[in-house]
């Protein structure tokens, strides 16, 4: 079983990218579980056809300790297993702590057991690695591979670099490695070349360049992944290609984060900061 965490700046398209990739892996015959680690609880919506899933923390709050696995896991597209950790009530408590509680409960209830025949577990993790709770999949060895969703925008690259610092910090203790950058295009000038160069300087690869296409939004409005909504569309093939590359990936590294001056130089060299 491969355990993968998807990180990236807030709003970069992590949840969309994760769910479309999972659809591609499921279509290939893989058994996949998705653990949403975001208080918004939108990490599994497209796989579940728009159903808003009751989160682990909400279930715990309402049911107490008497929770069964089927209360918190729903079956989605391609027999994927979907669960959302959720978060505390707004203004109360720590969302990162909620992720720790949720993942521990999933382990106790046997969500990762061999009987489920899982090939992959995906953690879709909120935003930047800003607090210990969100770093948990890296820190505690819950995830072995990290993929960072990035674009050619400065803050997305800045966040990717910060996430690499987190991976570096926990690489020895948790054994986690960076599998690559996924460029979710924003149609920035020289975007592909810039992210390839960022990946090179970090010591990793740009595993796939996902072009911008309105089909992604159309599928989302219809509460589906692109592969589910329009399987013959070019964008569906892009996600299939990304799924295949992740499936076949053998490049796992401890990244070399850039200094802020190096990152700014990269932006200047590719014409963004001019």
UniProtKB/Swiss-Prot annotation:
CDD domains (UniProt xref): NifH
- At what positions is ADP-ribosylarginine found? 97
Q: Which GO terms describe its biological process?
A: nitrogen fixation
Reported modifications of this chain: The reversible ADP-ribosylation of Arg-97 inactivates the nitrogenase reductase and regulates nitrogenase activity.
Question: What one GO molecular function would you report for this record?
Answer: 4 iron, 4 sulfur cluster binding
Q: Per its UniProt record, what InterPro entries does this chain match?
A: NifH/chlL_CS, NifH/frxC, Nitrogenase_Fe_NifH, P-loop_NTPase
Q: Which domain of life is it from?
A: Bacteria
Q: Which cysteines link up through disulfide bonds? A: none
**Signal peptide coordinates:** none
Recite the UniProt cofactor note for this protein: Binds 1 [4Fe-4S] cluster per dimer.
Which residues of this UniProt protein bind ATP?
8-15
**Keyword tags:** 4Fe-4S, ADP-ribosylation, ATP-binding, Iron, Iron-sulfur, Metal-binding, Nitrogen fixation, Nucleotide-binding, Oxidoreductase
Catalytic activity, EC: 1.18.6.1
Q: Which Gene3D superfamilies match?
A: P-loop containing nucleotide triphosphate hydrolases
- Which coenzymes or cofactors are required? [4Fe-4S] cluster
UniProt-annotated binding residues for [4Fe-4S] cluster: 94, 131
This enzyme catalyses: N2 + 8 reduced [2Fe-2S]-[ferredoxin] + 16 ATP + 16 H2O = H2 + 8 oxidized [2Fe-2S]-[ferredoxin] + 2 NH4(+) + 16 ADP + 16 phosphate + 6 H(+)
List the residue ranges forming a coiled coil, or say none.
none
One Pfam family of this chain: Fer4_NifH
Top-level EC class:
oxidoreductase
Functional note = The key enzymatic reactions in nitrogen fixation are catalyzed by the nitrogenase complex, which has 2 components: the iron protein and the molybdenum-iron protein.
Query: HAMAP family, alphabetically?
Result: NifH
> What is the protein's name according to its record?
Nitrogenase iron protein
Q: Which organism is it from?
A: Prosthecochloris aestuarii (strain DSM 271 / SK 413)
Gene giving rise to this polypeptide? nifH
């Amino acid at each position: 079983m491969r355990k993968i965490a998807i990180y990236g700046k807030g709003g970069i398209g992590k949840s969309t990218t994760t769910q479309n990739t999972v659809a591609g892996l499921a279509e290939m015959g893989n058994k996949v579980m998705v653990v949403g680690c975001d208080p918004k609880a939108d990490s599994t919506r497209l796989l579940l056809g728009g159903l808003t899933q009751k989160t682990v923390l909400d279930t715990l709050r309402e049911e107490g300790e008497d929770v069964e696995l089927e209360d918190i896991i729903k079956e989605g597209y391609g027999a994927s297993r979907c669960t959302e950790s959720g978060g505390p009530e707004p203004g109360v408590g720590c969302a990162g702590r909620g992720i720790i509680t949720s993942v521990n409960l999933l382990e106790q209830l046997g969500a990762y057991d061999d009987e489920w025949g899982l090939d992959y577990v995906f953690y879709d993790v909120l935003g930047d690695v800003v607090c210990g709770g969100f770093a948990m999949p890296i820190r505690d060895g819950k995830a072995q591979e990290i993929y960072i969703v990035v674009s050619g925008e400065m803050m997305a690259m800045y966040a990717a670099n910060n996430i690499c610092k987190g991976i570096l910090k926990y690489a020895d203790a948790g054994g986690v490695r960076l599998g690559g950058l996924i460029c979710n295009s924003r149609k920035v000038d020289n975007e592909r070349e810039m992210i390839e160069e960022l990946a090179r300087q970090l010591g990793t690869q740009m595993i796939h360049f996902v072009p911008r296409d309105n089909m992604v939004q159309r599928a989302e409005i219809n509460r589906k992944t692109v592969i589910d909504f329009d399987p013959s569309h070019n964008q569906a093939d892009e996600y299939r290609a990304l799924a295949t590359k992740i499936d076949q990936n053998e490049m796992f590294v401890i990244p070399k984060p850039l200094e802020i001056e190096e990152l700014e130089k990269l932006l200047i060299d590719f014409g963004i900061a001019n």
